[in-house]
Amino acid sequence: MNDEDQKILDAKPIADEIDSELTLRPKYLREYIGQKEIKDQLSVYLKAAKQRDEALDHVLLFGPPGLGKTTLAIVIANEMGAKIKTTSGPAIEKTGDLVALLNELTAGDILFIDEIHRLPKSVEEVLYSAMEDFYVDIVVGQGETAHAIHFPLPPFTLIGATTRAGMLSAPLRDRFGIVAHMQFYPVSDLKLIAKRTAEIFDTSIAGSGAAELALRSRGTPRIVNRLLKRVRDFAQVAGKDTIDEQIVDNALNKLHVDARGLDETDLKYLNTLIHQYKGGPAGVNALASNIGEDSETVEEMVEPYLLQIGFIQRTPRGRQATQAAYEHLQIPYQTGLS
């Protein structure tokens, strides 16, 4: 499998598609497809904040990559008519970096921190007073000359996004008034996203083609958009005016994306679990080592979708393959073996 195949189902953004994602992003809640429960709740919170002429409460968005956390943050800013400043946990290395960002904010602005779980502890602690009471105290100087400088801040909204909510400290997590767990998208929503994206691309797609794309996109909008771009290439070269189910199937087979959206890494994981560990239980570190990945990649990029479609289970003793996984791989299943 070459590098391109490995990237095709990566739910994290690829460098050369970041600009194209901007053209696909909805601007307002009414345009945002999926995550209905979250949208319904946000609609109430946004309306109430605007009626009171207050900044929206701080928001934590968590869930697997590619589900639209950054997009939703931008939508929230648009709905509030607020300016948004975007950064990431790894980009804020020192407390001074954070203070500089906070000092640029005006009343009602939004600060979006992606990968907020990767903030250094010292930086995170500065956020506590900023979020709760809208001020920061910074100690300058050393020894007898050390003194604190008090920086009042305007009311602002912090939106944090993370794929690893469990890695957030309790004090930080508790300061978010709005917490939204973003779920994998059902096929019906992904089909709508595929149709919307095709329209933006001025590309014709049949309902059957959109449905097949949706089924093989791992419940992830970013992936359905990426696959649509690749399938569009195959259709164009083949001289097809409309993307139908057959074109999608032929293209994705060539890209090593199977009927359930699994790639070679997923299949290697399942085959290792079934053949080498007799279906499990097996520890994630052992599985990751056997398939040549690190455990963080396996936990963040491989296992969430396999759990979602019911191909594996997490147990106190480790990962286990389910009967559905055996059936998908066409391996005889024996009760009690896994």
Swiss-Prot record:
Coiled-coil ranges (or none): none
The keyword Hydrolase belongs to this UniProt entry's keyword annotation: yes
A Pfam family per the record: RuvB_N
Subcellular localization(s) per the UniProt record: Cytoplasm
Catalysed reaction, written as an equation: ATP + H2O = ADP + phosphate + H(+)
GO biological process, one term: DNA recombination
Binding-site residues for ATP, renumbered to this chain: 24-25, 66, 69-71, 132-134, 175, 185, 222
Keywords, comma-separated and alphabetical: ATP-binding, Cytoplasm, DNA damage, DNA recombination, DNA repair, DNA-binding, Hydrolase, Nucleotide-binding
Primary location recorded for the protein, binned into one broad class: cytoplasm
EC numbers, comma separated: 3.6.4.-
Region (Small ATPAse domain (RuvB-S)): 186-256
One cellular component (GO) term of this entry: Holliday junction resolvase complex
Residues given in the record as Mg(2+) binding sites: 70
Chain positions recorded as DNA binding sites: 314, 319
Large ATPase domain (RuvB-L): annotated span: 4-185
Annotated region (Head domain (RuvB-H)), positions in chain: 259-338
Source organism superkingdom: Bacteria
Sample GO molecular function, one term: four-way junction DNA binding
Family: Belongs to the RuvB family.
NCBIfam families from the UniProt entry: PRK00080.1, ruvB
UniProt-recorded name of the protein: Holliday junction branch migration complex subunit RuvB
Species annotation: Oenococcus oeni (strain ATCC BAA-331 / PSU-1)
